[in-house]
Structure formats: structure tokens, C-alpha cells
Amino acid sequence: MSERFVRIYEIVMKYEGGYVNHPNDPGGETYKGISRRAHPNWEGWRLIDQKKPVSEDLVRRFYYDQFWLPLRCEEMPAPVGEYLFDFAVNTGIRQAVKTIQMAAGVAADGILGPITMGAIRRSDVQVLMYKFLAHRIDFYVTITTQRRRQFEVFFLGWIRRTIEVFSLLMSQK
């Protein structure tokens, strides 16, 4: 695992709790942000069901294999790949890719192909990061206003995380 991944993983884990089963979360049961509904075959669920500890290595490996690598974060300039990873952990890969596509000015189809990667690589990193920040906030505003009763409990936490991670990543450039 790369240094870039390890650094952003540690940041993201500050925002992802241990075991959570919030009734308003469409992801249902989660462990350190891993949704049982989205990832029912993750081996950590077996350990949790048996009341056994889940190693940090198992969680880290999951995020590396299921998020960092498919998102091709290492191929993106820092801190764009890191910010994309953070958003994907919270919203899922498809939504995160659509959002970075909007920020990069390409069709938002949720597919991370050569057009999207080219647009990301050609972008001014600082400008792209500010656009990505704005699109992330807009996403949270939109889903919260559409399903207020379900999501308003999460809204301020989402916005806080979005801004804090952005600020931290931009200060490390």
C-alpha cells in the first residue's frame, strides 16, 4: 500500500465510527464505514457476527482493494485522489466519480475512464479541488433537501467532514 493511501486512510478513519446501525442510514449496518448492505460478503461481517475483533489490517485492505485501486487514486494528482477516496467512502464509488466528473467538466456518467482521467490530469489541481468541494457540498444539500427527515441528522457532519478534509489536504500540498 502506498504512503498516499495510508495517510488518507488514517484521516478517513477519524470520521468513520466503529459499529453503527443508524436507522436513517441507507447503508444500514456499517463497521468503520463499510456497509453490510453494499458489501455483504466482506469477511469482517463474519467476525462481527461471532463477536470477534476485526483487525485494522482487514479494514485497511478492504478500502485499498475496494476503493483506492478501483478509483485509480494513485494515478491522480495529490490531493485529488485522496479527496475522491474520502468522498467515495461516504457516498459510494459511482456517486464520487460522477461528482469529480462534474468538477472536471466532463459527462457525469459514473465511469472512471480515459476521458475523465485525462480531464483530471489536465486540470489545475487547486481549481479542480475547489470545484470538487463545491460539488460535494451541493450533493449533500440536494439529498438532504430531497429527503430531509432521513438525512438532516447527518448533514452538518457531512459538511464538517467535507471542509475539514479539504482544508487538511490543501494545507499538505
Task: For every predicted segment, state its role.
Residues 1-173:
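Cell-wall polysaccharide-cleaving catalytic domain and substrate-binding groove, primarily
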